[in-house]
């Protein structure tokens, strides 16, 4: 099967890459440049094969739309820094983006050919106590299981939820205040329980949230992603939940590790292990479709690590860490 990598293009990378992944052995091979683009740091596929990236142009940042053959459809750009997150809403025919530097959430309408037109945008206002929280920093914009739009804002320690109509117009619904200085980055929902796991970048924690199904979140538990004796820099990055809802995985940049948690009966978390990611700055990772493997992309060491996964206890065993992908910061199937 094919596996895709989004990258920074500050050093040697040229854009979006694709490789072959052997679902039986976990072996990676045949890396190829799929799309030449500046800093396509996050990617999202539509079911029809269209690909959306947050790559930048000389005119500014935005979202680029490509067809199933990786041919550019259009690039919706506005002045300023590029976006950091993109997601597809199949039911409404929309695409969502998050702009970290501007604190914006953007909504685009998909056209018949898959190209995009900007439909709406909102700008968050706020700040936090950490030095990286001088202003709002939207880092994630995606759907709840009941189809509200939820946005994590690292700058003002909040989750915002919005109603979205069929035209992509947003209506503010609710907000959740995380621990001051936590820096909410990404959110992952449990597949069956009314629970969400909030990845907090700045204090290296996961906040386990009760989700009432109407856009409202309530804190149930806070748990660290680091060993108790770690005192150096760390910023968490990606979070994933296994398909069976039994385990949660989180990446640490700085400690350069993957934290493994067991989901208990009430959906709270218990640490299982923290394993080296065998690279520098594991900004993103993904579970293979059958959840037998976990694949980690490293931004600063240009390598990809493949772990096999014990589905009974969640533990990871490294298979390889020598497949080279330059400046990889996003990985998806």
Residue ranges and their predicted role:
Residues 30-92:
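Blade-loop segments of beta-propeller domains
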């Amino acid at each position: 099967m094919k596996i895709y990598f989004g990258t920074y293009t500050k050093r040697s990378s040229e854009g979006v890459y694709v490789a072959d992944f052997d679902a039986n052995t976990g072996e990676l091979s045949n890396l190829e440049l799929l799309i030449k683009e500046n800093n396509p740091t996050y990617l999202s596929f539509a079911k029809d094969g269209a690909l959306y990236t947050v790559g930048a142009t000389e005119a500014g940042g935005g979202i680029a739309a490509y067809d199933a053959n990786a041919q550019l459809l259009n690039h919706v750009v506005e002045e300023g820094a590029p976006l950091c997150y993109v997601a597809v809403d199949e039911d409404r025919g929309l695409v969502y983006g998050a702009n970290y530097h501007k604190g914006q959430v953007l909504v685009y309408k998909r056209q018949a050919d898959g190209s995009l037109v900007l439909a709406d945008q909102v700008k968050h206002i706020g700040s936090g106590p950490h030095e990286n929280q001088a202003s709002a920093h939207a880092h994630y914009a995606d759907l709840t299981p009941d189809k509200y739009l939820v946005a994590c804002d690292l700058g003002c320690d909040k989750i915002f939820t919005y109603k979205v109509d069929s035209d992509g117009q947003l209506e503010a619904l609710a907000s959740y205040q995380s621990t001051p200085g936590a820096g909410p980055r990404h959110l992952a929902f449990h597949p069956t329980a009314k629970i969400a796991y909030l990845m907090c970048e700045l204090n290296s924690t996961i906040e386990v949230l009760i989700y009432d199904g109407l856009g409202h979140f309530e804190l149930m538990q806070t748990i660290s992603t680091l060993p108790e004796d770690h005192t150096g820099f760390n910023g968490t990055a990606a979070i994933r939940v296994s398909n069976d809802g039994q385990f949660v995985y989180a990446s640490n940049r700085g400690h350069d590790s993957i934290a493994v948690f067991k989901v208990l009966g009430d959906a709270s978390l218990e640490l299982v292990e923290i394993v080296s990611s065998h690279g520098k700055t594991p900004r993103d990772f993904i579970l293979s479709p059958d959840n037998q493997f976990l694949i980690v992309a490293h931004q600063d060491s240009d390598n990809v690590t493949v772990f096999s996964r014990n589905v009974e206890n969640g533990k990871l065993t490294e298979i390889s860490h020598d497949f080279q992908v330059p400046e990889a910061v996003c990985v998806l199937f």
